[in-house]
């Protein structure tokens, strides 16, 4: 699984958001053109700009106009020209400073529950500012706590729409993001100021895991961070107004019901002015913050009150036409957002949607998200272990390999994982898997294992050498025989040439015979020097143990350096011949099982020098 398997596209505005903690000072809108990083499966989080809000004007309209709007108009089932016609008197364009001031006043009126003042401010707004006020009013939904507050804010939203607000896409996208941040912050024990630091660090880590141009990633990261900081400021502002200081209080079931009812009312008013794409992008925006905060969630967050709001929000977005549940599910799995994975599993189940739990398991295992892997297997019923296990073995990710093995793998899965580790020269993983593959399976597939490991080795046969030295068949005669069989397979084109050459040179019967000849030649050369050497220091004058050490210490060191239970055939041949010479040629050609005994004989002769 490649790194770029899941990578989100993040679209934000170029607008610099003010530092004041007024929720009215930031908005979002969709952008057609986006900055895209390398990636495939991931979802897109689309945010954007628009100028901040708000202003103040002496001009106004009859306050009874909005109250007199019919249900037909509120639900936008009549002619859009009706709304436009009724608001002709409001078409005066407010400048930026006026919009900002009006927005601040409106925000203050909403948080202080001064509905009368808020209604008067609505009448002063121009069309652009009305869209801004719609965002502010809708954002306030997630902080409702009483029935009068519900009636007040829903009444304001209706009036804002009646007066001409029409940017439902931006309002939905923005408030979905904010609602997600509210739910996430309710699960945390640290302060909001600490949350900003945690969020920034997590965002940086997430972008580093994505492929793409570094400059574009930095720009996207800065924009996402600004938007998230705005959301946290908005949460902090409302929390302080509710007397919670720098922390977010938990909502009761009754409060959550009010909040979701208010959002549902807004969706009903928007009607068909929200497209399936709008719901999809809002779903994406709601999931995005949860991946940033996932490492800080309390265990069981997905089944607690903090997650109830986001579950209800996501459910309504799916009902509206969001079709990216699986994409967000895969992304959450990749980033180890276990609690979000749980929420999305529940959403999929309730709405009879298919999510690819096996592919998600592959993503989670690739990035070593053990907690998410456990959730996908136990709660999502993921069963496809083979692919993730083999990829983990190829990468040498011992933690993931051990997790799969402990969960229970079939014999063939273990065998294939061993082959994958061997071909990638992941000796540590291969050593862990080897004793767990049943011997009958290894025996039946021994030739195929070595051939496959050699074929995918990329030029290094360290893994193949490890298997042979480890006596992977548990029978030295059988292990040597398998290696010799492959070395002799001159007509088998499926055997990689480098593997065949390696086995012929080191692990075949001919290699054993060559080793014996080499050792014999070394002995004869040594004897020639001993008897006919013209050096001033004659080897013949040295003590016998020292002469043995000079002749055979290099071979002994080479044998000791060779790790594993078996020596290569070539080295074994040299050892056999050396012992025969030391024993006065009285030793017959030994069985392979006696190789270690021969090492003991050689060691005995060498250590005599210390007696």
From Swiss-Prot:
- What Gene3D superfamilies does the annotation carry? Ankyrin repeat-containing domain
Q: Show the coiled coil region(s).
A: none
| Ranges of the ANK repeats in the UniProt entry | 292-322, 323-353, 356-384, 385-414, 416-442, 445-478
Under the heading InterPro entries, the entry gives: Ankyrin_rpt-contain_sf, SKIP35
- Name the UniProt key words of this record, in alphabetical order: ANK repeat, Repeat
Q: How does it assemble?
A: Interacts with SKP1A/ASK1.
Identify this protein by name.
Answer: Ankyrin repeat protein SKIP35
Q: Which organism is it from?
A: Arabidopsis thaliana (Mouse-ear cress)
Give the organism's phylogenetic lineage. Eukaryota, Viridiplantae, Streptophyta, Embryophyta, Tracheophyta
